Amino acid sequence: MAMTDPIADMLTRIRNAGLAKHQKCDMPASNVKLAIVNVLKELGYIKNFKQISDDKQGILRIYLKFDNENKHIIHAIDRVSTPGCRVYVGKDEIPVVKNGLGNAILSTSKGVMHDAAAREAQLGGEVLCSVW
């Protein structure tokens, strides 16, 4: 059976690996996933990532980040826009996650970026997920 939402699958893999205290998690790679993971690294939610080539589409390996008490840095990572219900926002309607403690990740005409960068560039787009 084909996967209907690969981004939700990626977020679930990150969430489950963090709850299980794994240091890394692997998943099939794609350009959108790579862009989302790049934003997560820029925001400091993950340590690092690398793309491993194989015979198919490649593997994306994400190294998770934990605090001093060995708790996962990401408290919650949720999909907002799904294939069945897309959520688009204008430049003035970009959501504030947890009163500014979290971040929303958007897909805009200038690429995938976090909510603060989209507000600064005055761009709206599709709200892919929220992280805090």
Curated annotation (Swiss-Prot):
GO terms for molecular function: rRNA binding; structural constituent of ribosome. GO terms for biological process: translation. SUPFAM superfamilies: Ribosomal protein S8. InterPro entries: Ribosomal_uS8 (IPR000630), Ribosomal_uS8_CS (IPR047863), Ribosomal_uS8_sf (IPR035987). GO terms for cellular component: ribonucleoprotein complex; ribosome. The keyword RNA-binding applies. Belongs to the universal ribosomal protein uS8 family. This is Small ribosomal subunit protein uS8.
